[in-house]
């Protein structure tokens, strides 16, 4: 299980939204390239990058910034936001993005997700962003008629890198993740699950570490890193030690 710091791009700046609301924007760093370097220096093994402009409009407004971030760090990047065509996906892979995250097209163009996952096995993730159990699309501005669990089941036939499960109601609130929703997704998904939304403390990370053996392989953290609620270096070490201790206890149990 890994902790993945998030950078959300809006007009070339590093920001966070509250519950996906574009009218509630907090700017944390006007230099997202520098921010990416900071997260790598603190031990991040992967970066979660979201093009909020792309998610809302479908247009690649932040491509220059994305390319600069890619050049400035050595860790792999997973990128989501406005990826709604094969050509766009190929553009991002060509500039060195490790994983793409598909959201809206998983609902609107499921065949496209299938085709991309075949052409790029284990390099396509699907973001299941849910509000009251129903999947939201178009930068969370529209509500679909499919539940998050039904979508997760439909994706079981695809060779995905991961499902990124976000509870919109908790995202950006620091009030803790929706553990029940995450467990339900992990239970029915063959693909690995990455948790996102609501992480506000080390205790929240520890609560999710208990489910590492149930298919939750990563935790995306955003606002809590920026406001100092969580120190990335400390969090990575804490989680590593906790998982090592769990593995030791499991091994010891069989030796008794």
Curated annotation (Swiss-Prot):
Recite the UniProt keywords alphabetically: Amino-acid biosynthesis, Cytoplasm, Histidine biosynthesis, Isomerase
Q: Which PANTHER family match?
A: 1-(5-PHOSPHORIBOSYL)-5-[(5-PHOSPHORIBOSYLAMINO)METHYLIDENEAMINO] IMIDAZOLE-4-CARBOXAMIDE ISOMERASE
Active site at: 8, 129
EC numbers on record: 5.3.1.16
In the UniProt record, what gene is named as encoding this protein? hisA
Q: In which pathway does it act?
A: Amino-acid biosynthesis; L-histidine biosynthesis; L-histidine from 5-phospho-alpha-D-ribose 1-diphosphate: step 4/9
GO terms, molecular function = 1-(5-phosphoribosyl)-5-[(5-phosphoribosylamino)methylideneamino]imidazole-4-carboxamide isomerase activity
Q: What is this protein called?
A: 1-(5-phosphoribosyl)-5-[(5-phosphoribosylamino)methylideneamino] imidazole-4-carboxamide isomerase
Q: Where does it localize?
A: Cytoplasm
Q: Which SUPFAM superfamilies match?
A: Ribulose-phoshate binding barrel (SSF51366)
Q: Which Gene3D superfamilies match?
A: Aldolase class I (3.20.20.70)
Q: Which family does it belong to?
A: Belongs to the HisA/HisF family.
Cited InterPro entries: Aldolase_TIM, His_biosynth, HisA_bact_arch, Isoase_HisA-like, Isoase_HisA-like_bact, RibuloseP-bd_barrel
**Gene source species:** Prochlorococcus marinus (strain NATL1A)
Q: Identify the enzyme class.
A: isomerase
Where does it primarily localize? cytoplasm
Q: Name one GO biological process term.
A: L-tryptophan biosynthetic process
Question: What GO CC terms are in its UniProt record?
Answer: cytoplasm
Q: Which reaction(s) does the protein catalyse, per the Swiss-Prot or TrEMBL entry? A: 1-(5-phospho-beta-D-ribosyl)-5-[(5-phospho-beta-D-ribosylamino)methylideneamino]imidazole-4-carboxamide = 5-[(5-phospho-1-deoxy-D-ribulos-1-ylimino)methylamino]-1-(5-phospho-beta-D-ribosyl)imidazole-4-carboxamide
């Amino acid at each position: 299980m890994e902790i993945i710091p998030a950078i959300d791009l809006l007009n070339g700046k590093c920001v966070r939204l509250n519950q996906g609301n574009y009218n509630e924007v907090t700017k944390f760093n006007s230099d997202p390239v520098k921010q990416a370097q900071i997260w790598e220096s603190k031990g991040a093994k992967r970066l979660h990058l979201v093009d909020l402009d792309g998610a809302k409009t479908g247009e690649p407004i932040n491509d220059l910034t994305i390319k600069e971030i890619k050049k400035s760090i050595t860790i792999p990047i997973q990128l989501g936001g406005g990826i709604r065509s094969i050509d766009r996906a190929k553009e991002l892979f060509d500039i060195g993005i490790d994983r793409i995250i598909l959201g809206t097209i998983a609902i609107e163009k499921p065949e496209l997700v299938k085709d991309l996952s075949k052409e790029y096995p284990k390099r396509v993730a699907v973001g299941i962003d849910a509000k009251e159990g129903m999947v939201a699309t178009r930068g969370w501005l529209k509500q679909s008629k499919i539940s998050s669990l039904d979508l997760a089941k439909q994706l079981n036939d695809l060779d995905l890198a991961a499902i990124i499960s976000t509870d919109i109601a908790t995202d950006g609130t620091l009030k803790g993740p929706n553990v029940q929703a995450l467990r339900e997704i992990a239970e029915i998904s063959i693909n690995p699950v990455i948790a996102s939304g609501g992480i506000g403390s080390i205790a929240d990370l520890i609560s999710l570490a208990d489910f590492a053996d149930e298919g939750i392989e990563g935790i995306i953290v955003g606002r809590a890193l920026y406001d100092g609620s969580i120190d990335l270096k400390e969090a990575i070490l804490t989680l590593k030690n906790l998982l090592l201790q769990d593995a030791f206890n499991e091994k010891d149990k069989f030796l008794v």
